[in-house]
Each structure stands twice: as structure tokens, then as C-alpha cells.
Amino acid sequence: MEQNITNILIKKIEELTETIYDETIRLEEPPSISLGDYSTNISFKLAKLLKKSPMVIAEELTNLLISENIEGIKEIKAVNGYINFFIDYNLYSKSGIAKISSEKDKFGQGAPKNKKVIIEHTSANPNGPLHIGHSRNAIVGDSLKRIVEFAGYVVEAQYYVNDMGRQEAIVVYGLDKFELNEQQKPDHAIGEVYFKANQLLNENPEQEEEILKLMKKYEEASEKGEENELTNKFNYAVNYALSGFKETLNNLNIHHDKFVWESSYVKNGMVQKVIQTLKDTGKVEKDEVYRLDLSEFGIDKKLVLARLNGTSLYSTRDIAYHIDKMKNCDIGINILGADHKLTAEMVNASLKLLGYNTPEVVFYEFISLPEGSMSTRRGTFISIDELYEEAKNRAVKEIKKRNETTEEEEINNIAHKIAVGAVRYNIVRISPDKAMVFRWDDALDFEKVGAPVIQYAHARCCRILEKENTNENKPIDATELFEYDLNEHEKLLIKILLKFPKIVEKSADAKKPQIMATYALDVAQTFNRYYANCPIFKEENKNIVYSRLELVKCTKTIIENALNLLGIECPGKM
């Protein structure tokens, strides 16, 4: 509807100005629905061109617009230079709500774009459990994957496995020194070995040479495509940790389509090819290492490509990975911590130097609990597993307090959905570029800002619809719905429900899943006000009863659709 209004508005501006108007027109929403559903200040922008007051221009444009009989618009008013549009809610409700009812979980889905997107997210080093800091990467990445896919793109989620770095060499070194606790979850067991190995290295600095030897031997074996005792140790250590990661991520409804190992680019010769190609650009300098000059891209620091002994570095392997990735997609998206900004700029500059497309990067700031931040290296961190368990335990207490159910299995099932929702939503609702403190009062808030607010609105819809099923009255024909004067709460709910397709598009285009998170909460809060002010079964008018029930059904659908795009399930009761 908005696009139709702006198209007609441009047409009328061109009639009035007798020129082609090619500027963007944005419709705003007035602070109150009583002032209109959409508004534009275009008259103020045209005042200088037409040498008239905005009030006069608004009146002239309004008269021209009224003559068009814009579909779905009941009234157009000029007020103090602004042009306000009022929706015909009886007509708008019939068509819009019918569309949600018929399309259900497909409502809002974008048309196929015939473009492939590769989103790389999580990609934590396999040297210990995923901690709360990793959760922001994984949750933002997975939510974005779901939204972009729903918007019509073919999307592949990748995990880039760092199996060649110093940290993994320390794990392999540690496995030779310490026994792996197989009673622990795999990633936690690996983390314990890594922590002990680090302590040993701190006490015996001369052992650092062993780590360098392990790294060099593993790379040499990879270059030759050899499988030996050492490569088997690395593979075992990495896969063992990854099995724990997958369990953690699966618990949060996060899945990757492909795990790409860093060493694969050494094995296939691509890393050496990248080094040589970059040398051929004449931008590489040699001192104690090989360095790439990226000053033409405004980067003063030189990128270290390789050691003089020929062994590669993470940066070179990262460039090889990105070349491969960008060759196999139309759009690449990386989710990275803000501390990786310079590295990302250097990799992208290297790709440009070689003539390749570059990925878009969504950076996120650090996340912490009120007690402080986390570090895998020190062995003092809060794992995602611990975060989830704490959320679930708190959810169980809340469910029992509300006496919604006494069945232990059902309590656990509902608590799991609330816990996942609490963790995922509390993280995704905050813009990634803002540092955040994870607070339990927000995450498990049933009243204002938490996922439980949205899930509870869904559960309320379910209860209302269960009551409908016990009602003996048969519903009227769908074409006869909304044949009465709708109140403000009904209008606001209809309006926000029908915004869903636009929110999907906006979230996907901006690469901002927090837009969807904010919208889902807005829907829940708008529905709660509707529920408080629009009685259903007490109404005698059959048209009102079934029109309002249809709104409840559609609210349930939209909440399910929105939360699904954030990886959150909706309990039928809470």
C-alpha cells in the first residue's frame, strides 16, 4: 500500500511542478492513528521550487490525490502543510487478514531472488566450550541466515574450522600430556586439556618450541596430502571438540550447512598459489617475513603473508578461504567480533587487489554478564551450556510458580523453549554494534522486554482459540468479517500484523535481525492491549466475535513466523 501511495504521490507532484520528480519519498507514521496512518512532509520540500507556502501546496496535492481514489485509502487530509492518509480498515482488514489466514507460515516470504548467499558465523577455535561471547556471533548469524533465506535467497551457513593455529597445536600437545576426561561433554573436556597445557607452557617456556614444531609438521603433512599419526591427532582433537559444539548449537536451534577446514586450502595448494599471486603484484616486501603493502587501500599496517621458511599464516589461509567462498556465491556475509575489524579490512583489501568480490561484514561488540567478561585462555569463562542451564532452571521455577502444568515432562519441554527464547532473544534484540551485559531480569522478563512476553502472547492466543473450539456457534463466512466500525486497538493490531512482509525485507536488506526482534515484541504488546480492550466471547454481535477471533488466529501465525526467523519456538502454554 505504501508503495502505491508514493507512486501516485510522485505522479501528482510531477503534474503540479510540470517537471520529473526523481527524489525518494518516505511516508511517516503519525504518533496517533487518529491523525492518520501515513503522513508526508513533501509540501515543505516543494515550497522553494513552487514559491508557495507548504499549506497551499498540501491543499493542492491533497485535491489531486483525492481524485485518484487510491485503493485502500478512505480519506486524505491536508493539516498544517502535512498530507495525512487514512486507511479504509474494513477493506484493508478483509484482504490483508484473509491473506495471512490462507498463506500461514508462507506469509511474508519473499519471491525467489536467484542469488546464493554464504553466511559464515560462529567459527570458534575448537579448543574449549563455546562461551557467552561466541553466542552473540552464532545467534546473530543464525537469525540472519533464517531471515535472508525467508526473504527469497538461497543461503548456506558455513563454519570455518581453524585446525592449523597455535591454539589447536596446544590442544594436541596437551592430549599427549594429560588424560582426556571422556565423562565430560567433548568440548569441555578439550577445554580442560587446553587450560592445563597452557599452564604447563607458562611454567616451562622452553616447551614453546614443541608447539612451533607441531604447527610446522602439520602444515607440511597437509601440503603433501599425507595422513599420519600427527594429522590423525589433529583431526581427532578438532572433531572431538566440534561434536560438543554441534550439541551446544543444536540445543539453541543453530545449524551449519558446511564445515570448511582451514587445512583444506593448504592441501589443495591454494594457499601457496595465493602467496605467489600476491608476490606477483609487486606489493610484497621481504624482511624477517613476507609482508603485503595495502597502503593504496588506506591501510597503513602491512599484512604478514608468510614466514621465510615458507609456512603460511592464518591471514593467508583466510584469504584462500574467502576466494573460494566468493567464487561460490553472489553475496558473502561474515559475522565477526569488533576486534577483527582491521583483519577483515586487510583480507577484503587483498581480495580487491586480486580482483575478487568482498563479503559484507556484520561486526558485533563484546557481551558479558554483570560479574565480568570471559576468557577461554584463562579457563575462567561462562559457557553457552551453563548459560542455557541457568535459563532453563529459572524458567522451570517460573512455570511452577504460575501453576500452568504439573507434568514434569511438559514442564521441561516448555522450560526448554523459554530458555532458548530467553538466551536467543535477549542477545539478538540488541544491535550487534553495541556492547551488552546479559541480564537475567531482561532475558526472562514476562512483562516488558523478554522473549517470554512474546511467547506468552502466543500462548494466550492458543487459549482463546481452544475456547473457540468449545463454542457451539458456527463461524460466519470469511467474506462477511469486519463489517462494523473497528476501534483503535483493532486497527493498530491489523496494521502491525500486515507489516510483517516489509519487516522481513527490511531486516534482510539491512542485515539487521534486531529489526525482526523489535517487531515481534511490538506485535505481542499490541496484541496484549487488543486483548485487554476488545472482549471476544462477551460480544453479542456475531460479526465482531468472529472478526476478533480471526485477528487472534492471525496474531498467532505472525508471532510464530517472526520467532521462527529468530530460531525461537512458541509453547502452546506457559
From Swiss-Prot:
Enzyme class: ligase
Domain of life per record: Archaea
EC nos: 6.1.1.19
PROSITE patterns: AA_TRNA_LIGASE_I (PS00178)
Short name of one Pfam family: DALR_1
Residue interval(s) of motif 'HIGH' region: 124-134
Compartment list: Cytoplasm
Gene Ontology terms: cellular component: cytoplasm
SUPFAM superfamilies (alphabetical): Anticodon-binding domain of a subclass of class I aminoacyl-tRNA synthetases (SSF47323), Arginyl-tRNA synthetase (ArgRS), N-terminal 'additional' domain (SSF55190), Nucleotidylyl transferase (SSF52374)
Entry keywords, A to Z: Aminoacyl-tRNA synthetase, ATP-binding, Cytoplasm, Ligase, Nucleotide-binding, Protein biosynthesis
Reaction(s) the record says it catalyses: tRNA(Arg) + L-arginine + ATP = L-arginyl-tRNA(Arg) + AMP + diphosphate
GO biological process: arginyl-tRNA aminoacylation
CDD domains in alphabetical order: ArgRS_core
Keyword Lipid biosynthesis listed: no
Protein name in the entry: Arginine--tRNA ligase
Gene: argS
